Amino acid sequence: YKDATPEVETADLNEAIRLHTEVVGEAPVGLYIGRCSDNTVRLAAENGSFKYVADSIADDVPYWMEFGEHDQLVVPYTMDANDMRFATPQGFNTGAHFFEYLKASFDVLYAEGGRMMSIGLHCRLMGRPGRAQALQDFLAYANSHEGVWFATREQIADHWAATNPHTRYERPSEMSRETFVAK
């Protein structure tokens, strides 16, 4: 959607919601475009039907964004702990490389506490036996640690919204000069 107008992107978003609802029987609760525009998250927020948007690789925890009167929860995706790196130069060459990277990432996040580790998976890549074994080994490793929760993005969004509800603050950049000086 890099060069798409907001009107085209909105029409496509509405059609995708309609089609998903028709096929699945309910509307989608989250959105991941993957090749989004500068308008994608704002348009999703304005639509108002998504618990979360995943079009961000900006953090290890969910966060809120504001668009006018619309608040949108973002549950970040990942490009580093992602099996797509099997298909790119300087990526993972073996299942063992993938396992070691996931393990190292997990160990840091687990030590920090209260973090989310997203792992990007694609059937055509992770579905190979040696790679699938590496994923199975990593899941067993992570599961051997106390307090680890394997959750869907919807579960993460629900938990984050319940425990970290969005609070709006006055931003100096949005204040009049008089208000800014008075504060």
Predicted feature descriptions by range:
Residues 6, 30-31, 128:
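A generic secondary-structure micro-motif detector
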Residues 10, 34-35, 132:
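Short alpha-helix boundary/capping motifs
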Residues 99, 103-183:
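C-terminal domain-boundary segment and adjacent tail
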Residues 1-2, 81-83, 123-126:
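A short, flexible beta-alpha/helix-coil linker loop
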Residues 3, 38, 128-129:
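Loop/helix-junction capping segments adjacent to catalytic residues or to phosphate/diphosphate-binding pockets
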Residues 1-14:
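Glycine-rich phosphate-binding "P-loop"
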Residues 18-22, 26-113, 161-169:
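Active-site-adjacent pocket scaffolds in enzyme catalytic domains
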